[in-house]
Structures are given as structure tokens and as C-alpha cells.
Amino acid sequence: MYAIVEINGQQFKAEAGQKLFVHHIEGAENGSTVEFEKVLLVDKDGNVTVGAPTVEGAKVVCQVISNLVKGDKVLVFHKKRRKGYRKLNGHRQQFTELTITEVVA
């Protein structure tokens, strides 16, 4: 059984026991339980239910493993030729690591 769930504006395929890295969730503590009710599709033993826009009564229950995981550093370099203008910016996205405990449909 799996579900397509929307978390912080991104869609993920969620199955029980799976680990997900999602964009940082404000206020979630390590070890706490988080529920996502914006389920777009549920597949239960080949029986597919598609929501319009969401499936009623369906939710995905997750446990927070680590609330602050930093991604790889992304470097952005700007340059204008012959003018000596150079600028370097770096960014590290913060993620939350989740383990899916169950998919309720």
C-alpha cells in the first residue's frame, strides 16, 4: 500500500517504513509524530483511489528522526567580463528526516 502525499509544496510517494527528506518543518521536534492529511492518491492492493483534489479520510503518519539536516552546499557564481566584477554566493538547504510509520486510507 502506498500513497502520494503533498508535504510543504512537494509530492512524495509514501510507503510504510520508508525514509523521506523533506524541506524543513517548523516546530517539529525529534521523535515527535507528524500527520499529513493532503493525500492525493492511495493504492491499496491494486485498488487505486484518486482524490479530487484530496482523498477523504486518508492520512500519512510519520515520525521525525532529525529536524535539522543540511543538504549539500550549492554555489552560485556571478561574473561580468572585463569589469572585474565577481560575486560568489553559497546556500545550504535545511531538511527534515522522516520515517513513515503508516498510511491510513
Swiss-Prot record:
Function, in words: This protein binds to 23S rRNA in the presence of protein L20.
Family, as annotated: Belongs to the bacterial ribosomal protein bL21 family.
The entry's keywords: Ribonucleoprotein, Ribosomal protein, RNA-binding, rRNA-binding
UniProt-listed NCBIfam families: L21
A single BP term in Gene Ontology: translation
InterPro entries linked: bL21-like, bL21-like_sf, Ribosomal_bL21
GO cellular component, one term: ribonucleoprotein complex
Upper taxonomic lineage: Bacteria, Pseudomonadati, Bacteroidota, Bacteroidia, Bacteroidales
One example GO MF annotation: rRNA binding
HAMAP family named among the record's database cross-references: Ribosomal_bL21 (MF_01363)
Name used for this protein in its record: Large ribosomal subunit protein bL21
SUBUNIT field: Part of the 50S ribosomal subunit. Contacts protein L20.
Domain of life from the UniProt record: Bacteria
